[in-house]
Amino acid sequence: MRAALIYGGDDKKLELFAKKIFSAIGRKGNELKVIKVGRGINAGNLSPYEFIFVGCPVLSVFKGKLPSELIDYIKRCTGMERKKTIAFIISRLMGNDKTLKNLMSLLESKGSFIVDFKQIRDLDKDSELLASRIKY
């Protein structure tokens, strides 16, 4: 099965999580395309993918602010309609619920179907857990 991982924001734990979930999905015989959004990254067509993972770090305690480059990328993407999507954040002490809610709202505004969401606390355990959510 083909999946895409889209993530934005400068966070070392997020980078490490992307590597761990890439390995976990590969071990299960699935293909994962990793897309780190940033300046100069063109939004693509996500139609070829059956599953889409989207994640970011928590940037603010109260407002649930998302990385601007992630918002811009998702808004410009095509092919997200009716896609099975998993939203995740790299959790902090505070601000987790609001950030996750805002991320899911952004994805749903593009027509994605959220099948799971997760606040990432244990990189190893949570990468295996989310990788196991890919089902035919």
Predicted regions and their residues:
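FMN-binding flavodoxin-like domain, especially the glycine-rich phosphate-binding loop
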Residues: 3-9, 13-37, 44-136
